[in-house]
Amino acid sequence: TLLESDIDTKEDALKIANDPEARELGDAYALLARVYAGPRFTWEESNFPEDNMRTYQCLHDSIRRCSPIGTLQALRIKGSITPTVEKDMQISFDDAFRIVYDHANRGDAYCQYVIGNIFFWRDDNRIDSAEAMLTPPPMSWTKRIQKSLTANSVQDRIAALQGTVPDETLQENASNLAKEWFNKALDNGLAMFQGNLRNIYIDEADFSNARRVAKTAAELGNPAMMLYTGLDCHENGKFEDAFTWFTKGAALSQSESIAELADYYYHFYDAKNLRCTIPYDPVKAIGLYRRAATKQFSDAGYTALQAAFGYIFHIGHLPLDWGLIADLTHMAATKDRFMFALP
């Protein structure tokens, strides 16, 4: 495989960038960089080790090995495009975008996701060919005047005369392209990174599509989307379906799903249909509360206290273990549940 030291010209770099076999090591480094970048770039339940130094090393190796994916991905990982790295870039952002866009059009799910991310995060302002997709072709003065006469606001009229596109329109166009490519990636089975697509629909108050995205991704194995789908089922009184999704999420160590499943077994919710449908198992619930308490999420303190109360009140014939109770209440205190923490 060619190293960056073997690349003498831009033509050499583009030849590698356009050849999947020649750039495969660079692409592998790009994906490895994402793994090391932490849960914001993978998914929390994967438990991949977060290592900033390895992230930058892998990403820089990827860029120097002419990976279009790595080159574009660097726009998303803060601090990656240092002046030194940008100087060593073998291909431009435009070259990288063109190559990834071509593979996205051929049906590559990860490339489709990368293109969607370009428009979601508005990285098009660094990529001429992406920016061009958001703006219509130049119009003659005659057409500009005609358009200005039919504009709904003074701002739109001025923009029409200047031949520019209002920021609101650019944002709408970018959002539409992001949705298009994220949906294509989801349809092709890429489920782990669909939070951005769901968030777009939520921001647009398009809750039907937000639910569709969550359920599709959940069915494909996304733990967080299992939680969201379960919560949606719960809110709509579909307790058996919610229980199923919380169980699946908990099996993949999704923190909130573990807590919700514990609440279900504990019959925490005062809903007759839930209590008729879900078996009451306080011992299993306390075990799940203890498991959830070890996680880092907003309700971890609550789950620690629930587990402590289970032992304090002998729920399900649990032993009165003051050492364990002290550990659990201390855990609750360290996770911002000070009000009920015992001394």
Model-derived regions: residue spans:
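Fold-core signature of tandem repeat domains
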Residues: I63, A104, I115, L186, ...
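Short helix-capping/linker turns of helical repeat alpha-solenoids
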Residues: R23-G26, G38-R40, E44-E45, R65-T71, ...
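Short coil/turn linking the two alpha-helices of tandem helical-hairpin repeats
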Residues: E4-I7, A33, A37-P49, L75-Q90, ...
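TPR/TPR-like (Sel1-like) alpha-helical repeat modules
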Residues: Y56-R64, P136-P138, V283-A293, W322-R337
